[in-house]
Every structure is written in C-alpha cells, then in structure tokens.
C-alpha cells in the first residue's frame, strides 16, 4: 500500500468556496451550535484499509493556517467581514473532532463539535479519501493522463457545438471533493483557463487564487439541514435559513440550493420576497429539465422576468449534458453549469468514488436531507425523517 510522508492537503483554502461562505454565516449567527456529521460511501468500495493513512493525513492538518498572502486575498472580497477573517487567520483544525475507524472493511468517520469548526472538515476529508484510494488503486495515472482525456472531450465538445451560439455559456469547476488528486484538479482547471473560454471560475478558493479566476459557491445542504433544529418551527426551517443568509450576504452570494427537502417544498417557501432578492437557484438532484421548467414557471407566476435570474446546474454533469441543458434554457434564463467529478476524476479505467459527508445531528437532535432523488436521502433517525416528510408533504416512498 502506498504511504504518504507528506501532507496531501497543504492549505486551508484547498476547500470549496461555500464552506467558507457558510462558516462566516455560522460565525456571526450560530457561534455555539454543535453538530455531528458522518461519512457515507454509496458504492461498494471497501475503504476501511485506508483508515490509518487518513488518520495520519488528518493529523498533519492541525498545522494548517491562513498565510498572510491568503489573508490579504480574502480581504479583497467585499462579503467577507474583518472580524471573521481575523478569527479565520487564527483558526486551526481540531483533530480530536474526527473519529475514524474500520469495521468489516468499511470506513467509518464521525465528526462532532462546534458547527463553525466542524464545517471545514468535509471537503478536505473527502478529497483525501479520493486521492488516497486512487493513488493506491490506479498508481499509474498521472495529471498528463487526465489532460490527454480532457483534450479529447474538449475536441468533441467543440465539434458538437460548432453551430450553437455559446456566447452565454458559463462553466465552473466543482470538482474538489471527489477529485482523482489535487494535481489532477489543478492541471485540469489550468488547461481549461488556457484553452476553454467558457470557464468562469472554480469552487476551490486555493485554485481560484493561484490561477486568478473567480471563486464560486454559496451554501450547501447543511445550511438548511441545521435550521431544522435551530428554529422553533420545523415548517419554517427553510424560510429561516433563507432569511439568515440574506441578513449575512444581502446583495452577494445569492444562489439558493433547492433540494434539501424537495424542489416543490422549496418553492412553497421561495416567495416573492426571496425570489426577488436571490440571484437564482441551484439544481443538485432530480430531473434537471423538469426542475428548470418548474423554476421558470415559478418566477413567471411571481411576476419576475426569468431573464433577470440564474439557474445553476450542478448534478452529475458532463459536457454532453451541459450542451443539452444550455440549448434548452439559455434563451429563457441565465444558466451556469458546475461540473465536478466528470471533470476532475474522469479518466479512462478510473471509477470515481461515490462518497459524501453529511450532517446527521444539530444540537443533539436529528436532521435530514431528502432531495429530489430518492437514493440521495440521508437521515439516521427514521422517526424524524417521517415527521419531516409529513410537515413538508413529501412522500416517504423509496426514501
């Protein structure tokens, strides 16, 4: 088995943008909230054999901190507040929050502690698992291998779009969590910046800083999940989450995620007030065409011109799906496409891991993610899941 005597994650900013955006909101609104998150491998991979390597890597992360150059970079964004950035500069990973073990070949990870601290563990841990697994399973693969296949895909893309107006096409790298490796992600995004005019940014703050492109991201499911136990009324949990985000960011970072419960449940709460203030919404599960059509109808019903809003698609995209969705929607509404695993771990003979880390508790009580794809439901408490479905009028079937 390949051993690592060096840290794979080398900077605090090697993470997804929405983690830092959510962390700031938690820092100001929920400093004393405690959460628990757990790892799930949705595939049939036995990853327990890597537990000790991961423990070593996580131990190395205790020394990570924001450098002066990174701090100065972060101050360039108007939505980051001085108090938060000053705190972030002093932040250190608390390794004791992460418990890792192997049971019957399966990898088990449980992370618990203050939400403002726990929130930064998910992305680097998933990236570590993916890189360690692929480094051992496919050691012959290099960044050059990934670039060669990317060039083939780009050639097909340009052939397919020869007669399509791509002047409104915008694509973002969303590939940190399940990347083959950091080197592969960096090389891929660098190549796209150099030869693909439709790349507008990356969800990875470190890569965005190094390559001088825009960091992109707003909030994740955990923002909505935690609010299921923060407020006093479960039915109003999405409304509270949406409102708190507006309090924090006002005219910035205005893309809302729709599938923490379901799109229908989200739209019930996404009233004229929210639909007007938020720049747009993000798709992460379910049929993207049906979802997009629902979004258009909702904006029209509220009297909002869809051309002033944005749909961000981010569920299991590849270049072929992007072309199809772009053709379907770009004349009706602004569209952005976040492409992840099919960008940073799309290499012949390499099977990406289907892994997640999700919140399971907030303040000692269960939380859930339901989504528009039954296979993506995540909750450890069946009674709470049933109650959540009843409150939001969602079917429990296949969940």
UniProtKB/Swiss-Prot annotation:
Signal peptide: none annotated. The modification Phosphohistidine is found at residue 221. It holds the Pfam family NAPRTase. Keywords: Ligase, Phosphoprotein, Pyridine nucleotide biosynthesis. One of its GO terms (biological process) is NAD biosynthetic process via the salvage pathway. One of its GO terms (cellular component) is cytosol. It catalyses: nicotinate + 5-phospho-alpha-D-ribose 1-diphosphate + ATP + H2O = nicotinate beta-D-ribonucleotide + ADP + phosphate + diphosphate. Transiently phosphorylated on a His residue during the reaction cycle. Phosphorylation strongly increases the affinity for substrates and increases the rate of nicotinate D-ribonucleotide production. Dephosphorylation regenerates the low-affinity form of the enzyme, leading to product release. SUPFAM superfamilies: Nicotinate/Quinolinate PRTase C-terminal domain-like, Nicotinate/Quinolinate PRTase N-terminal domain-like. GO terms for molecular function: nicotinate phosphoribosyltransferase activity. Pathway: Cofactor biosynthesis; NAD(+) biosynthesis; nicotinate D-ribonucleotide from nicotinate: step 1/1. The keyword Ribosomal protein does not apply. Its EC number is 6.3.4.21. Belongs to the NAPRTase family. Catalyzes the synthesis of beta-nicotinate D-ribonucleotide from nicotinate and 5-phospho-D-ribose 1-phosphate at the expense of ATP. This is Nicotinate phosphoribosyltransferase. It comes from Buchnera aphidicola subsp. Acyrthosiphon pisum (strain APS) (Acyrthosiphon pisum symbiotic bacterium).
